[in-house]
Amino acid sequence: MNIKIVCFGKLDKKFFIDSFNEYANRISKYANLQVIELKEEYQKEDVVNKNINSDLLIDKLKAFSDHEIICMDVSSKNYSTEEFMSIIENNKNLKQAKIVFVIGPSDGFSDKFLQQNYKKVSFGNITLPHQLFRIILAEQIYRAFKIMNNEKYHK
């Protein structure tokens, strides 16, 4: 199985890097994980930022037309761990078994981006720093694999 995380910016603090790498190493037992970091554009107005960065994402995601694209969007349907696991499990059972998780820019996705035919998932209605969310996403991916394989995982 191939999993990609497309996101903006780099992890810049050692504790973020170490935490993410811990989960990435754990995930490697079950899937190939690749992180694609995009440079976020900052202009003066939030709406301009949303449009520029969302257009960059739309263009970048064209290369992954054979993947299921899942946008992590706080305003979308909340998924439980089990529901999230089902997304991964359903893709694992497909021949292509390719998923791209998209973490949007700091100003959020543009309306144009949200109108694309991508699955949208939320882990809740709280606002998190992007670097921390990347770790939480990796942890949930790892947890999903543990559940799918009936392996114990400390709760």
Swiss-Prot record:
As given in the record, the signal peptide range reads none
| CDD domains in UniProt | RlmH-like
Compartments reported by the entry? Cytoplasm
Entry GO terms, CC: cytoplasm
The protein's predominant localisation is: cytoplasm
Q: Which UniProt keywords apply?
A: Cytoplasm, Methyltransferase, rRNA processing, S-adenosyl-L-methionine, Transferase
Q: Does the keyword Nucleotide-binding apply?
A: no
> What reaction(s) does this enzyme catalyze?
pseudouridine(1915) in 23S rRNA + S-adenosyl-L-methionine = N(3)-methylpseudouridine(1915) in 23S rRNA + S-adenosyl-L-homocysteine + H(+)
Q: Example GO molecular function term?
A: rRNA (pseudouridine-N3-)-methyltransferase activity
| Entry EC no(s) | 2.1.1.177
Q: Which residues of this UniProt protein bind S-adenosyl-L-methionine?
A: 104, 123-128
Q: Supply the Pfam families for this chain.
A: SPOUT_MTase
Give the similarity note. Belongs to the RNA methyltransferase RlmH family.
Q: How does it assemble?
A: Homodimer.
Quote the function comment for this protein: Specifically methylates the pseudouridine at position 1915 (m3Psi1915) in 23S rRNA.
**What is the name of the protein in this document?**
Ribosomal RNA large subunit methyltransferase H
| Originating organism | Mesoplasma florum (strain ATCC 33453 / NBRC 100688 / NCTC 11704 / L1) (Acholeplasma florum)
